[in-house]
Amino acid sequence: MAQDAITAVINSADVQGKYLDTAALEKLKAYFSTGELRVRAATTISANAAAIVKEAVAKSLLYSDITRPGGNMYTTRRYAACIRDLDYYLRYATYAMLAGDPSILDERVLNGLKETYNSLGVPVGATVQAIQAIKEVTASLVGADAGKEMGIYLDYISSGLS
């Protein structure tokens, strides 16, 4: 079950029936110290999500064989489904970044996704390439530190699909 960083630390101590130890408090301190950065990044991502996805597609997919007749993204319907999926990955990576917990991505995005893509003939490699382009575009908008933080969750999705 997905938990935010705070709940995970507290639940771990609670299961053991003890107060938070130094290591647990350090985890919370690290989480809180990056809180403002994560919120600012999420604000920027939310305000620019469509542009992020559009630019990422242009960088990674638009002029490749995948969008030409016979390619897996050919036809408006398939292209629209790809855009929808990339937006979905960006949104859930943003949620996970705010929570400080990638397990949200397992539960809400990755469970069964690779198998579904393979059964539908969706090219996983091209999808991973587009997610990496989202990571680059996002980092250019939110800055290096927030981009690195967000990159953790986009890389997690890429790894889960690979």
From Swiss-Prot:
Alphabetical list of CDD domains matching this protein: APC_beta
Binding of (2R,3E)-phycocyanobilin, residues: 82
Protein name: Allophycocyanin subunit beta
Location of this chain's protein in the cell: Cellular thylakoid membrane
Post-translational events: Contains one covalently linked phycocyanobilin chromophore. The chromophore is added by phycocyanobilin lyase CpcS 1.
Keywords, comma-separated and alphabetical: Antenna complex, Bile pigment, Chromophore, Electron transport, Membrane, Methylation, Photosynthesis, Phycobilisome, Thylakoid, Transport
Biological process (GO), any one: photosynthesis
Quaternary structure annotation from Swiss-Prot or TrEMBL: Heterohexamer of two alpha chains, one alpha-B chain and three beta chains.
Major localization listed first in the record, in broad terms: membrane
Gene Ontology CC entries for this record: phycobilisome; plasma membrane-derived thylakoid membrane
Described function: Light-harvesting photosynthetic bile pigment-protein from the phycobiliprotein complex. Allophycocyanin has a maximum absorption at approximately 650 to 653 nanometers.
Membrane topology of the entry: Peripheral membrane protein
SUPFAM superfamilies, per database record: Globin-like (SSF46458)
The keyword Transport is assigned to this record: yes
